[in-house]
Amino acid sequence: MQSVFEQIARSLKKRRAMLFVGAGVSMSVGLPPWRKLIEHMADDLGLDDQTVGMPDTTYQALAEYYRLKHGSIGPLRSWMDREWSVSRDKVKRSEIHKLIVSLDFPIIYTTNYDRNLEAAFEIYGRPFVKIANAKDIAKVNGDLTQIIKYHGDFDDDTSLVLAETDYFDRLSFDSPLDVKFRADALGRTILFVGYSMSDMNIRLLLHRLWQTWRLSGYERDRPKSFVFMPGPNVVQEAVLGRWGLNVVAGDDEDPQQSLAAFLS
């Protein structure tokens, strides 16, 4: 039986592999955690700690309230654009970003808003096309790596999936980017990195993908897909395994070191 590395390498050689990049990759170069975003919104909106600390006060709900109060998400996007950015030098020093570029995935999806992936490709002189909305899909060139900003991009406020309504709209999975994802994913090996698997949108996406294959009657022909996790998790291994996803667990206490070791 082929190892995980051999299966991914074979799919890469055939240009039939895609990478899905989560927040853990951005945090590896110093991007702040979601708690900082929550604190900023609470301070801007004049909310006390008790309100913000309530179990049902999610960052998505706060962003929705922010949009209602300010009329748009624009000011918050501008703040995030400043705070959710790191120097190109930090990206250049990132072993994880260097490895992602060198692995040469033809298609990369990310739920991160920042420009770190794009910066890494520019630093190493690798051409790419960024896709954040329906208009960008027309730019697709089969010879260039595609970086699909699945939850939007700071260059386009309307593309951001940030507030609660944005997430609910995304749950229908019928936007142009969702249609593209299904088309890209059905015939390819997928590797998910940088995810804690706590994002219900991603979990629902994985479930929908499994359901599509199951209902097709050709589930046995589905390409292998993998989820990298920094350490073992028997619950996730069982649940994701039910959906046809293979969990690959790292063995380093440091999540970033664990991911870098896996990618290398």
What are these regions (language model features)?
Residues 1-19, 25-29, 40, 44, ...:
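SIR2/sirtuin-family catalytic core signature
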Residues 11, 71-139, 161, 169:
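Active-site periphery "cap/insert" segments of enzyme catalytic domains
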Residues 19, 27, 31-84, 127, ...:
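A phosphate-binding glycine/aspartate-rich beta-alpha loop in the early core of alpha/beta enzymes
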Residues 61, 89, 225-227:
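Glycine-centered structural positions embedded in regular secondary structure
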Residues 149-154, 164, 229:
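Short, structured patches in soluble enzyme cores that scaffold and shape functional sites
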Residues 157-177:
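A short, charged helix-loop
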